[in-house]
A protein has these predicted regions:
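A conserved beta-strand element that flanks and buttresses the S-adenosyl-L-methionine
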Residues: 98
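A short glycine-rich, Lys/Arg-flanked "PGG" loop and its adjoining helix->strand segment in the class I
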Residues: 110-122
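Short catalytic micro-motifs in class I SAM-dependent methyltransferases
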Residues: 101-104
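C-terminal lobe and adjacent flexible extensions of AdoMet/dcAdoMet transferase-like proteins
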Residues: 202-211
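Conserved class I S-adenosyl-L-methionine
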Residues: 1-38, 51-52, 125-153, 180, 187-189, ...
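Class I SAM-dependent methyltransferase SAM/SAH-binding core
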Residues: 43-86
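Short alpha-helix
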Residues: 154-170, 174-176
Length: 211
């Protein structure tokens, strides 16, 4: 699995990115916080080094990369090495499942979403943060991904594609917010705002419930 290998080999480089892009990172956290509940049992699938789970109060995480999980564990998270399509979790365990820039690295997104629904409690929330392929930054990432350490094997999707997969998995109505407008080299203060719905923001957050 080349994607896992990249993150395994460059876990520190990945983690350092957040310190070097603090304003972008905080805008993404703010967008996710719009939908992440303050209470309940949550898990982040593709938790990486824990950069999103920790500020959002998510206690558990899974990831296929052992080295990424080592960093997440040092941040106080309870973690397990696994992939999202085959979660080592009983049915209906969580009030929240969180994914952040994960679906672009998943081989079978529909299978992933069905598995996430399985582990969610009735009325539990699924919150997905992803790069909108149709945004300015998304198009830039797509055109330059062959030269990217992390995005070389990524597949970016439109909001409509992700929404269709979520609906097909059996989830309920969808809500959205977005941030990171413009780019790709820098973002103004206005470009880092969090807005309801979706249009041309690069980072889109989708929220739905397990009905």
């Amino acid at each position: 699995m080349p994607v896992v290998t990249v993150f395994e080999q460059h876990a520190q480089h990945y983690d350092d990115w957040f310190d070097g892009h603090e304003s972008v990172y905080q805008a993404e956290v703010a967008a996710l916080r719009k939908f992440v509940p303050a209470t309940g049992l949550g898990i982040e699938v593709g938790v990486g080094t824990g950069r999103f789970a920790v500020p959002l109060g998510v206690e558990f995480g899974i990831d296929p990369s052992r080295r990424m999980l080592q960093k997440a564990r040092r941040r106080g998270l309870s973690v397990c090495q696994a992939v999202g399509e085959r979660l080592p979790v009983r049915d209906a365990q969580f009030d929240l499942v969180l994914l952040v820039t994960v679906i672009c690295f998943v081989d079978d997104v529909p299978t992933l979403f069905r598995e996430l629904r399985r582990v969610l409690k009735r009325d539990g929330q699924l919150v997905i943060g992803f790069i909108n392929r149709d945004s300015e930054l998304g198009r830039s990432y797509e055109s330059r991904k062959e030269a990217s350490m992390f995005y070389r094997d990524a597949r970016f999707y439109s909001v409509a594609e992700v929404a269709d997969w979520v609906k097909e998995a059996g989830f309920g109505s969808l809500r959205f917010c977005e941030t990171l407008f413009g780019g790709p080299t820098e973002f103004s203060a206005r470009g880092l705002e969090v807005r309801e719905g979706y249009s041309d923001g690069a980072f889109v957050v989708l929220c739905t419930r397990n009905t």
